Amino acid sequence: MSETTPNNTSNNNNNNNNNNNNNNNNNNNNNNNNNNNNNNNNNNHNNNNNTNNNNIDTFSQKASNDIVKPILPVTEDLQNSTKEMFTKVSSYIKSELATTVSDYNLLIQMNNITSSKYQDMTNVTKGLSVFMGDLKIKYEEFQPYFDKINELDKNVTDLEKTVQLLDEYTKRLEQKVKNIDKSSLLPTKQIQPPQPIPQQQPAQPAQPTQPTQPAQQPSQVSTETKPQENIENK
């Protein structure tokens, strides 16, 4: 019994080793298969890239055949021309920027002046509104005086009409007085006494006749009553 036990253990170890070797072989086979698959994928990818590159080459060839390539100048001349163009463009842009900045500053100054003028006009407008309010108050205060002045103007107009009537009446009265003076200067005729009629009875002595008075009393009466009538009519 003691001899069979080591043999069994050795057999078992051998079997285990064989199994391990088999597993390793299987793993190696799997790795090889994976490597082959990766190689195949890489080959396919390379084939695709080559196909794309071939397509790009064909497209570039077609484009080069269709478009005429310009004849480029010498590299040094191209650099000089590019430098000159860059200098001119930069100077142009700088001048445009300077002009824009000056215009912007001018606009700022104009805006400031406009705002100051607007503020001044606002202050003037406020002053004018206050002044107009004061004038309105003064006009309301003077309104009673204006009413009195209008009333006095109306009364003066009526008085002027009355004075005009009195002036006309005075002129007519003066004319009548002149006429009366002229009539008083004329010689009056003497009235002869009547002849006595022979009668049986003795005639009584005739009474002396009184001189006739000038005809100015009726005119005086008419002139004295006329102003009263005019005044009453008024």
From Swiss-Prot:
Positions of region (Disordered) = 1-58, 184-234
Name of this chain's protein: Biogenesis of lysosome-related organelles complex 1 subunit 2
Q: Which family does it belong to?
A: Belongs to the BLOC1S2 family.
Quaternary data: Component of the biogenesis of lysosome-related organelles complex 1 (BLOC-1).
- PANTHER family (UniProt xref): BIOGENESIS OF LYSOSOME-RELATED ORGANELLES COMPLEX 1 SUBUNIT 2
Q: Which UniProt keywords apply?
A: Coiled coil, Cytoplasm, Cytoskeleton, Lysosome, Membrane
Q: What organism does this protein naturally occur in?
A: Dictyostelium discoideum (Social amoeba)
Does the UniProt entry include the keyword Nucleotide-binding?
no
Single GO molecular-function term? gamma-tubulin binding
UniProt cross-references to InterPro entries, sorted A to Z: BLOC1_su2 (IPR019269)
Q: What does this protein do?
A: Component of the BLOC-1 complex, a complex that is required for normal biogenesis of lysosome-related organelles (LRO). May also participate in the coupling of lysosomes to microtubule plus-end-directed kinesin motor. May also play a role in intracellular vesicle trafficking.
Q: Which residues form a coiled coil?
A: 145-184
Q: Name one GO cellular component term.
A: gamma-tubulin complex
Q: Which GO terms describe its biological process?
A: endosomal transport; lysosome localization
Record-annotated disulphide pairs: none
Please name the Pfam families in this protein's record: BLOC1_2
What is this organism's lineage?
Eukaryota, Amoebozoa, Evosea, Eumycetozoa, Dictyostelia
Location in the cell: Cytoplasm, Cytoskeleton, Microtubule organizing center, Centrosome; Lysosome membrane
Q: Where is the composition biased (Low complexity)?
A: 7-55, 200-218
